[in-house]
């Protein structure tokens, strides 16, 4: 019986993961945000769990705070499509606001754009922010490398 439940849970998790991946790719393409970056943010924020809730009150796959969700017209933060759409739209908005600087984008995503833009590039004031930016950057590079290998592009 245990093995059966494990298979059922694994199947549900795989289906959930596939759904998250499909919406991540769809909205990344729609908003012109790199797929690899969106997947890195999702992995760090929630591990792809649509039911994730943080101690600060962020919820869903991309861990949207209530105010951010409201600004991007999210009705249900636990709805995968709506959450990913809003999260990617927010990343696109941050990209434009931060002049394309991924470090500032990621620092703004975790700490809030007003706080980060006020401090400029000195987001090392917080070990949480620094660790977050470092982790997303690592996963982004890993995801990018995997994409290049999958596409058969030679790397140097």
Walk through the language-model features, giving the residues of each:
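Generic N-terminal initiation segments characterized by hydrophobic and/or small/turn-forming residues
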Residues: 1-4, 34
């Amino acid at each position: 019986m245990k093995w059966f439940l494990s298979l059922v849970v694994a199947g549900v998790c795989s289906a959930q993961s596939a759904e998250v991946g499909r919406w991540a790719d769809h909205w990344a393409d729609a908003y012109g945000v790199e797929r690899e970056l969106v997947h890195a943010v999702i992995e760090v924020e929630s591990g792809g769990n649509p039911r994730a809730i943080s101690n600060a009150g962020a919820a869903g796959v991309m861990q949207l705070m209530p105010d951010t969700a409201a600004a991007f017209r999210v009705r249900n933060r636990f709805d995968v499509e709506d959450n990913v759409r809003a999260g990617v739209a927010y990343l696109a908005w941050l990209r434009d606001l931060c002049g394309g600087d991924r470090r500032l984008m990621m620092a703004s995503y975790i700490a809030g754009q007003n706080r980060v833009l006020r401090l400029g590039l000195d987001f090392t004031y917080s070990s949480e922010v620094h660790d977050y930016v470092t982790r997303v950057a690592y996963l982004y590079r890993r995801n990018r490398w995997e994409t290049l290998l999958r596409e058969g592009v030679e790397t140097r």
